[in-house]
């Protein structure tokens, strides 16, 4: 073994002690509100179809799987937790490890801790209020402000994202010195995401957390489409100090619509040369059985701890980041 082996933790022990205190505080927050802590598999037979997410894949070759069984490390506990909701669990939360085969850096690590919770009979706004309560308790920050996706674009880019044509989006991109990317991009949502990341995100959540809600319906993911305005989805994200902290939905409960969205994702995957994913029939079965109307949110715990401690990067609050794993 090399005498210079870098064996020490990524984070200072003092930071890990503070992290443990925050995790205990999160658990108290939900215990006080009667929300049940659950544990679901870190590996499963199905994974997400979302073209923006990349899973780790492995093969199980134990007894009963001589030909191999493809398994995926979970990018989120969402599908399993929804099956619990359909089985009658009531309100639930989970603090668990998730895995994404994507980037590693200041705000990203392939293995990370996710806080995810679901509230039957909550709408999007009521869940946003609960997220705000948690952030105030953990971060000792002001109450959050809220802007619709449309309001944010109008305020910072003077453009309506729900009606603007692709050519108009490219014009705005040019003003942000993004022509080299935008001019060859044909997907409207990718253009919107580019403008949001460069033209909106730097301006929001600087002094207090900011909720952005009512994303375009084309970016609904697993959220319901708004009954008041079919152009938007009942989806929100939370930003603070340059960091995206959470992503929440009023959850889609229609099994047929969910199956159609999975199939649409797979068509996009095929067009992009990405692997087509098997549709999670267990989730579809749970939705057919009847998952209660609910709202749910996923929050990055490592990022939350980083902000709470005033740290500069995730590795400052993780025992061993990927470079030391």
UniProtKB/Swiss-Prot annotation:
InterPro entries: Aa-tRNA-synt_II, aa-tRNA-synth_II, aa-tRNA-synth_II/BPL/LPL, EpmA, Lys-tRNA-synth_II_C. One of its GO terms (cellular component) is cytosol. Keywords: ATP-binding, Ligase, Nucleotide-binding. It is an enzyme of class 6 (ligase). One of its GO terms (molecular function) is acid-ammonia (or amide) ligase activity. It catalyses: D-beta-lysine + L-lysyl-[protein] + ATP = N(6)-((3R)-3,6-diaminohexanoyl)-L-lysyl-[protein] + AMP + diphosphate + H(+). It comes from the Bacteria. ATP binds at residues 100-102, 109, 244-245, 300. Coiled coil: none annotated. Substrate binds at residues 76-78, 118, 251. Belongs to the class-II aminoacyl-tRNA synthetase family. EpmA subfamily. This is Elongation factor P--(R)-beta-lysine ligase. It comes from Photorhabdus laumondii subsp. laumondii (strain DSM 15139 / CIP 105565 / TT01).
């Amino acid at each position: 073994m090399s005498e210079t082996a870098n064996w020490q933790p990524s984070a200072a022990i003092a930071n890990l002690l503070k992290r443990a205190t925050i995790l205990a505080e999160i658990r108290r927050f939900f215990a006080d509100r009667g929300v049940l802590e659950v544990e679901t598999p870190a590996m499963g037979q199905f994974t997400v179809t979302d073209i923006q997410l990349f899973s780790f894949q492995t093969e199980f070759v134990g007894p009963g799987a001589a030909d191999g069984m493809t398994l995926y490390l979970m990018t989120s506990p969402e599908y399993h937790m929804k099956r619990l909701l359909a089985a009658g669990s009531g309100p639930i939360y989970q603090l668990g490890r998730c895995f994404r085969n994507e980037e590693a850096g200041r705000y990203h690590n392939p293995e990370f801790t996710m806080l995810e919770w679901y509230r039957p009979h909550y709408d999007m706004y009521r869940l946003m209020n609960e997220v705000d309560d948690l952030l105030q308790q953990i971060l000792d920050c002001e109450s959050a402000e809220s802007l619709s996706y449309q309001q944010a674009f109008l305020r910072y880019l003077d453009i309506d994202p729900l009606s603007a044509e692709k050519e108009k989006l490219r014009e705005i991109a040019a003003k942000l010195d993004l022509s080299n990317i935008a001019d060859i991009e044909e997907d409207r949502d990718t253009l919107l995401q580019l403008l949001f990341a460069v033209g909106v995100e730097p301006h929001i959540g600087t002094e207090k957390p900011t909720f952005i809600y009512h994303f375009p319906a084309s970016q609904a993911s697993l959220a319901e489409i708004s009954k008041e305005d079919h152009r938007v989805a009942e989806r929100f994200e939370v930003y603070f100090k340059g960091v995206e902290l959470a992503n929440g939905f009023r959850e889609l409960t229609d099994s047929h619509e969910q199956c159609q969205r999975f199939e649409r994702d797979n068509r996009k995957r095929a067009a992009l040369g990405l692997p087509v994913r098997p549709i999670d029939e267990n989730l579809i079965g749970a939705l057919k059985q009847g998952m209660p109307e609910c709202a749910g949110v996923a929050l990055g715990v490592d990022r939350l701890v980083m902000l709470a401690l005033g740290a500069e990067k995730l590795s400052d609050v993780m025992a061993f980041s990927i470079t030391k794993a």
